[in-house]
């Protein structure tokens, strides 16, 4: 899994004219858990060490990379251990029109004619900032990804926070194409990564630490708007009763499967189960022909950690009830 998606750090700007060293705090539930320290020079070369401790687990990655004029990596090398302490050794380079990569889980090469951004299997979280800046430079703010895929970036609002020298305006961007949900990253007006935050894990420079509640509120508003649009696009409410006919229905009482069954749903409740011949739908009922496929009650998932996409994914996979373990009850 590409662990850098949710862990972004403040570092280098779009235009850097001199060598620079930067460091940022890693917080887990508001408590100090680690640091990331980066050294950047004017040639576009970065040396970054990223390390944190989460109850004995946690990444410790040292990486070096080079960028071209478009901000896209042409070389990457990383080593250390991942979150579960498994060793990491990863290399990537672009040479003679070919991109080549190798890590613990895959090895490949691909001819490239335009810009393509390599996503390491295990990278320091600053690499998310590198991707954001490259996307902002790219045509239509889109880039092909290696080994596969495409990413895009969109601005989602601004927040004014207290910085080391007074008020600073931070810009919220959301990167699409890395996972089921857009990934949020905060940049300042110079293109420097300003923060990556969540209720669990945050990476942020000390000067912005007190602004975490402001940034979280802005992120949550953007997340709610995205979830609302998704629900509007995907949800369809029947105008009347809903009848599923011609189903092979699972009966949990005796673990049998009964053919030729109908199920009547009214509103958000199953109100009747009967043989097809005994079910007389109302005139305005919506009929779904199961074509003798298997039908069963919704599943329970007894151990989840909810995010904005869990509801849609659960329903798509037949899960209608779930339990979140030790997370924010507002998400439940």
Predicted regions and their residues:
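N-terminal mature ectodomain segment of secretory-pathway/periplasmic proteins
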Residues: 27-103, 191
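Metal-associated gating/positioning segment near the N- to mid-region
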Residues: 289-332
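Short, hydrophobic/aromatic-rich segments at coil-to-beta transitions
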Residues: 18-25, 43-49, 69-77, 97-100, ...
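Gly/Pro-enriched, hydrophobic low-complexity segments
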Residues: 51, 55-58, 64-68, 169-204
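Histidine-rich, glycine-flanked metal-binding segment
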Residues: 254-296
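Extracellular/periplasmic ectodomains of large secreted or surface enzymes and adhesion receptors
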Residues: 205-246, 279-280
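Hydrophobic h-region of N-terminal signal peptides that target proteins for export
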Residues: 6-17
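Solvent-exposed helix/loop surface patches that form functional interfaces
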Residues: 31-33, 82-174, 197, 212-223, ...
